[in-house]
């Protein structure tokens, strides 16, 4: 005699989704990890730094992968920025509400930055790597200037 266990066959409902503050926290963790990897690279590229290309490439590849995932941590329910509100730096968003009305641009920016980081991870020489990291820093700074509220 066979025993069958009935399992629901319907997709996850909204109540099965993480709370918006949990998603905001997750994206802050991911952004912190991107920043940490970028800091490692920029420290190696500083005048007093020592570039170990293989290590820097690994950091760039990690950044590329993280940037591919990053826009997916901005579901509409996390559009919660309010001017003048008291904020918990861990779970409250600083994302500009305009990000969601122009999400395609945000997604494109993250994709382009990911591709630059990937190209850096594949660079064969320091003189190829260095300008790509400069481009990546410019992309990061431009995206932050556009999409991050400072209140």
Locations of regions flagged by a protein language model:
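Bacterial N-terminal signal peptides
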Residues: 1-7
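Sec/Tat signal peptide C-region and signal peptidase I cleavage site
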Residues: 9-14
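Acidic, metal-dependent phosphodiester-chemistry machinery of nucleic-acid enzymes
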Residues: 18
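Sequence context surrounding c-type heme c attachment/ligation sites in exported
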Residues: 21-151
């Amino acid at each position: 005699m066979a025993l069958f266990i009935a399992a629901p066959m319907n997709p996850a409902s909204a109540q099965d989704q993480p709370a918006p503050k949990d998603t905001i926290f997750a994206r802050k963790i991911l952004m912190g990890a991107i920043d940490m990897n970028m800091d490692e690279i920029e420290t190696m590229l500083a005048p007093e730094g020592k570039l170990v290309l293989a290590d820097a490439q690994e950091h760039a590849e990690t950044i590329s992968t993280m940037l591919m995932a990053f826009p997916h941590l901005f579901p509409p329910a996390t559009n919660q920025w309010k001017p003048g509100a008291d904020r918990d730096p861990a779970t409250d968003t600083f994302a500009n509400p305009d990000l969601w009305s122009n999400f395609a641009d945000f997604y494109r920016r993250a994709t382009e930055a990911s591709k630059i980081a990937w190209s850096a991870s594949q660079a064969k020489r320091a003189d190829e790597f260095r300008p790509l990291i400069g481009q990546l820093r410019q992309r990061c700074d431009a995206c932050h200037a556009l999409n991050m509220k400072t209140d």
